[in-house]
Structure formats: structure tokens, C-alpha cells
Amino acid sequence: MLETYTDFGFYCFIDRLVDEENMTANDNDAFTRVIHKLERLAPLEQADRDAIRALPFRIKTAPPNHYLVKEGAAATDCCVLLTGYVCRHKTTSSGDRQIVSFHMPGDIPDLQHLLLSRADHNLETITEATFALVPAEDLRRVAQQRPLLAEALWRDTLIDASIFREWVLNVGRRDAKSRIAHMLCEFAARREKAGLGPPERFNLPMTQEQIADATGLTSVHVNRMLFELAADGVIVRDKRQVEITDWSRMCRVADFNAAYLHEAA
């Protein structure tokens, strides 16, 4: 197996070039989580799973707060997140950031690269993250050959759009406490669907600054709202660990209805 160190101008990381002949059993399992996700979106056949596992890919690991994709870059690959958390964000000409989504293992956060030639957003790690880069043309070819896989990828894109619509509502119309509570509920629900643990207790990977940039608030306001949620008795916080003590009440505070997730991870 070939290992090289590659500097893309953003950071230096290990690039493992993988092909079918030298793929290990561990490498072959790289797509297990994303396959499980896609199976919830369409009734995949064994041939669909085999086609996904046969895709060429490169494994990369990046530290926190580093760009995987920069807005305007050529869109040649699709990123399958294996471990860790990343966010999508846009920035104004003056450098102000708006986080537009969070992503977790099993997600393909830049699936639009199947058809779009340029990235229209930034993709940045929140934690250390490991991901597989799949050439977009190879994934597009397999999707054209496997209708059920194409259906699953299309549904994933539609659910992504549904989540975007909910985020617009969250930032535009909910009060500060509801925004924070809603973000926590969504994160917990998506983690559970992704098989990452129960929704009632989790480690929150986002900083208060990142939460602020996702909810249109300041870090100070986020901190105050987290304290209020704890004072209300709906969450217990221990540094990064969050426990939702009353899920039904938390959902009422958040105005949270998981229907917009369409049972997606």
C-alpha cells in the first residue's frame, strides 16, 4: 500500500492510495456506515452494496479546524465521513461565517459534487476526522448503473434540503433558547439514527463559537442559553457532555418535530 504525505495548502495529512487489489478487510469496511444509512433510504440489493465497496477511494485524516473543501475549488471528489465531525459553512466578503450544517460519520456532505463542478461552500473539520475521498465520476457511474443506489443518493440529497429549510426557520423565527435546544435535539436524533449512541446523552463536539455561527447568535448568548436550559432542568452539562433529562419537554422548548429528518441520519 502506497503512503505519501501531501500538502494541499490547507494542512499536511496522510494520503493512502487504495485500490481493489491491495484493499484490506478493514479498508473494505470503510463504507459500512454509509451503506447502512443508504439502506434506510432505499431497499438496496447485495449488488448495490458490492458496487459501493468496490469504489476506489483514498483515506485521509485531518485535525480539527482544517478545511477539507474550500468554496470555489474544483469538485472532483465526494467525501464519505468515517469518523469525527465536520461542518459546512459560507463566509461573507468581510469574513463573517455562517455554519449551514453539521455532519457525522456516514454522511456524504458534498454529494452535490456528483453533478456540480465547483464547491459552493466550505467543508471544515470540527474534531479530528477520518474520511474517504471517492472520485465523483466513479460514484456517478455506479449510480447510473444501480437505480436503487441512485434513489438512495437522491433521497439523501432531498433530506439534506429538508434540513436546510428547517435551519432557515430555526435561525429566522425561533428565539435564542429554542434555537439552541433545537440544534441539540437534531444532533441527538441524527446521532441515534447513525448508530452513534442514545439521544439522551452525548459528547457535544461543537464549541460555543461554532454553535453561535450555526444559530445566528453570539458565543456569550449561546453560553447564557445553555445555562438557562440547565437551570430549566431539561439538560445537565458536564464540560462537553450533555444529558437531556426530559426529552419531551426539551422538544417542546425547541419546537422540535423530527419529521423533517425523514428518518435520516
Q: What is the predicted role of each segment?
A:
Residues S101-E166:
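Cyclic-nucleotide recognition modules
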Residues A189-A265:
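Phosphate-/nucleic-acid-contacting segments
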Residues I59, F102, L133, P205, ...:
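Short aromatic/basic micro-patch
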Residues Q144-G216:
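Polybasic "coupling" helices that flank or enter modular domains
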Residues H66-E128:
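Cyclic nucleotide-binding regulatory domains
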Residues T83, E137-D138, E209, S248:
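Alpha-helix/helix-capping structural signal
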